[in-house]
Amino acid sequence: METVPPSPITWPDGGALTNDWVHGLMSCFEWSSWNLPPSQLPSLLPVNVFDSLVLTAHKILHKERNCVHIDDLDSVSNVVVVGDIHGQLHDLLFLLKDTGFPCQNRCYVFNGDYVDRGAWGLETFLVLLSWKVLMPDRVYLLRGNHESKYCTSMYGFEKEVLTKYGDKGKHVYRKCLGCFEGLPLASIISGRVYTAHGGLFRSPVLPKRTTRGKKNRRVVLLEPEPSSMKLGTLDELMQARRSVLDPPWEGSNLIPGDVLWSDPSMTPGLSPNEQRGIGLLWGPDCTEDFLKKYELKLIIRSHEGPDAREKRTGLGGMDNGYTIDHNVESGKLITIFSAPDYPQFQATEERYKNKGAYIILQAPDFSDPQFHSFEAVKPRPKAHPYYDFENVIDSDDEMDKSAMDTNNEQPNS
């Protein structure tokens, strides 16, 4: 790594990013991770440049639908699907180099969880935003459960941003939260592959108005029994309100929480995800029903690393960065996890030493997954954790719901 410091990043005249600008940003972040204390990041990426990048990306993301249909693939030879990254910047940079950077014949779909746990969540997210701005129809960024106020306050991202940007940290953090709200929830690739961070979702409960007068009108939601829950539809997914800081676990807007937090199970049917306190568990029959109804071949989700899978019965481990969880008549359900040697700050003997992985879907039908596992980049720069990794809840279990912000108020700048 060069010891000569790079020049500070400036926003290009006219605001149009170039390939060289994005590569310069990546090089700048990699250099700073080795050579500067975190609090010096603004010397390379001034707040005004951060603001311009996030504002430009925010406008693009908020125009995308809840489920983006990626169909303009005539010139694309492959689509790369990436799982959780969790602030492991150097592994992301390796993955991009190993696979090939986004270009007109190579499309990327990132399945969420860009931040938290790892030490470079901000840099990771900004690298991905810069690629999105440069190539909006070749890079798709979906939301993960960690792109939320609750998770980022518990698993390190908020503290990371405040450490790096000091008295401007609250401003930077709020801008990131606003951008998180704009991230789409899911994608459908070439009409054959559905991707989302957590996975499937239930049909929402419709409110029942139970009063006579307008002044005293109340809305009552009757929560269904697990046996009466129905698998949701893509139309219902499109109509969900995604612009919330923390997806609700109750009420009529359950789809965002389901899509971000749910997990597969080997038990048939839908049931509450009691271990997480939000979202669903769905069985192989639900996978088959969803694939068959929409003539899909694959569901690709993320959300579970080696720590989560250690506790799951009947499902494969995450040693190689991926598992095939359901193999049904119409196709497959796959979990992909792209953060190797996870989690970063655990003592060596307590880390899982897992590989990360990504999936390549090749033309013409993009439905035959090729799995590519990779080792963590070593050595990593020295860094301090931004969360209490020894005592914090594992794998997002047993959530403190009182700490979640489930309204749809935009964060102030």
Swiss-Prot record:
Catalytic reaction(s) noted: O-phospho-L-seryl-[protein] + H2O = L-seryl-[protein] + phosphate; O-phospho-L-threonyl-[protein] + H2O = L-threonyl-[protein] + phosphate
Keywords: Disulfide bond, Hydrolase, Manganese, Metal-binding, Nucleus, Protein phosphatase
Record keyword Cell inner membrane present: no
Region Disordered, residue ranges: 391-413
EC number(s) from the headed UniProt entry: 3.1.3.16
Subunit-level organization: Monomer, homodimer, and heteromer. Interacts with calmodulin (CaM3 and CaM4) and HSFA1A/HSF1.
PANTHER family (UniProt xref): SERINE/THREONINE-PROTEIN PHOSPHATASE 5-RELATED (PTHR45668), SERINE_THREONINE-PROTEIN PHOSPHATASE 7 (PTHR45668:SF9)
Name under which the protein is recorded: Serine/threonine-protein phosphatase 7
Gene: PP7
